[in-house]
Amino acid sequence: MGGKWSKSS
């Protein structure tokens, strides 16, 4: 959880 989830959140 980091770049990928940051964009989604």
Swiss-Prot record:
Residues 2-9 are annotated as: N-terminal. This is Protein Nef. The gene is nef. It comes from Human immunodeficiency virus type 1 group M subtype D (isolate Z84). The Z-84 isolate was taken from a 54 year-old Zairean male. It is found in: Host cell membrane; Host cytoplasm, Host perinuclear region; Virion; Secreted. Keywords: AIDS, Apoptosis, Early protein, Host cell membrane, Host cytoplasm, Host membrane, Host-virus interaction, Lipoprotein, Membrane, Myristate, Phosphoprotein, Secreted, Viral immunoevasion, Virion, Virulence. The N-terminal domain is composed of the N-myristoyl glycine and of a cluster of positively charged amino acids. It is required for inner plasma membrane targeting of Nef and virion incorporation, and thereby for infectivity. This domain is also involved in binding to p53. Factor of infectivity and pathogenicity, required for optimal virus replication. Alters numerous pathways of T-lymphocyte function and down-regulates immunity surface molecules in order to evade host defense and increase viral infectivity. Alters the functionality of other immunity cells, like dendritic cells, monocytes/macrophages and NK cells. One of the earliest and most abundantly expressed viral proteins. In infected CD4(+) T-lymphocytes, down-regulates the surface MHC-I, mature MHC-II, CD4, CD28, CCR5 and CXCR4 molecules. Mediates internalization and degradation of host CD4 through the interaction of with the cytoplasmic tail of CD4, the recruitment of AP-2 (clathrin adapter protein complex 2), internalization through clathrin coated pits, and subsequent transport to endosomes and lysosomes for degradation. Diverts host MHC-I molecules to the trans-Golgi network-associated endosomal compartments by an endocytic pathway to finally target them for degradation. Belongs to the lentivirus primate group Nef protein family.
